[in-house]
Regions:
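Interfacial helix-cap and linker-helix signal at transmembrane-aqueous boundaries
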Residues: 1-4, 84-85, 116-117, 121, ...
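Intrinsic disorder in cytosolic terminal tails and internal cytosolic loops
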Residues: 35-45, 125, 242-262
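Juxtamembrane intracellular "pre-TM" segments in multi-pass secondary transporters
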Residues: 31-63, 87, 259-261
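Extracytoplasmic gate region of multi-pass secondary transporters
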Residues: 56-113, 168-176, 206
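Helix-loop-helix hairpin linking two adjacent transmembrane segments in secondary transporters
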Residues: 1-32
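C-terminal transmembrane helical hairpin of 12-TM major facilitator-type secondary transporters
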Residues: 128-175
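A late C-terminal transmembrane helix in Major Facilitator Superfamily
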Residues: 110, 180-219
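Juxtamembrane helix-start elements in MFS-like secondary transporters
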Residues: 91-99, 131, 157, 192
Length: 262
């Protein structure tokens, strides 16, 4: 952007995204073949209806948890550049390097966390404990990071950015593994679909609300406080609203949902 303008950034990243098509198509072709082989010998089991999922407290818990995670994610993605330039005095070039490096940290931590939790479970650890500890650490840490960026010195604010990205990356495997465990093969697709539809409303709310708050106050402090509060909501969703992480008994839930005769 500094050397070639903002249009070049869209062109470059648009072209780079096309590189993903070839390996994705090859993997998809192999998966389709495997799915056909499994489906040929599988016994079809009906999925729970959408109405039953909407009555499930745990589904609303994961949706709230994802909304909370996504609020801070979209807040940072949309406003971190301006924050670094306007509030912390970085040049556009330095801002780009810092922001890019922080997302590299997020990606690496996502890979490491996925590997670590799988190894922990294979060695006899509890999926319930493992995933919930990670989600609690990520959301509790995000609260502290938002406060560090709002009120901290320059070094503390920069450290908070990188710690936040590391925690967000580490928690990302759980966002999809948890509904897979709870929903099982019968309900995972619908569960994740509802969860993502609700959770990604944060992508609408966070950029707009942040812009409104900055316009009204002239600084980022209140916006960071709101983001910290949203992170606390994630603790309610992931810890307060979820049962033990194991596949839910959909037959029992369906029977319980049937009204009894007067």
């Amino acid at each position: 952007m500094v050397n070639f303008g903002w249009r070049s950034a869209f062109l470059v990243f648009g072209a780079l995204s096309l590189l993903w098509l070839w390996p994705w198509a090859r993997v998809l072709r192999r998966q389709r073949q495997e799915i056909r082989r499994v489906a040929d010998g599988a016994v079809e089991v009906p999925s729970p209806p959408m109405s039953l999922l909407l009555q499930c407290r745990a589904m609303w818990g994961t949706a709230l948890g994802l909304f909370s995670s996504n609020y801070t994610f979209y807040f940072m993605m949309a406003w971190l550049p301006l924050y670094l330039v306007r509030e912390r005095g970085f040049s556009v070039d330095d801002m780009a390097k810092l922001a890019s490096a922080s997302y590299v940290v997020m990606a690496v931590c996502a890979l490491l966390a996925g590997w670590a939790i799988d190894r922990y479970i294979r060695s006899g650890g509890s999926a319930n404990r493992g995933y919930k500890v990670i989600m609690a650490a990520a959301h509790g840490g995000a609260v502290l990071c938002m406060l560090g960026m709002a009120f901290g010195s320059q070094p503390l604010a920069l450290a908070s950015i990188f710690v936040y990205q590391a925690l967000t990356g580490a928690s990302s495997p759980g966002v999809y593994a948890i509904p897979e465990i709870l929903g099982g093969t019968r309900a995972t697709g619908r569960w994740v679909g509802i969860q993502n539809s609700l959770g990604n409303l944060a992508g609408i709310a966070a950029p707009w609300l942040t812009g409104f708050l900055i316009d009204q106050t002239g600084h980022f402090t209140v916006a960071f406080l709101v983001a910290a509060a949203m992170s606390l909501l994630g603790l309610v969703g992931w810890l307060g609203m979820l049962p033990k992480l194991e596949e839910l008994d959909w037959e029992a839930r369906a029977l319980a949902a049937v009204p009894t005769a007067p």
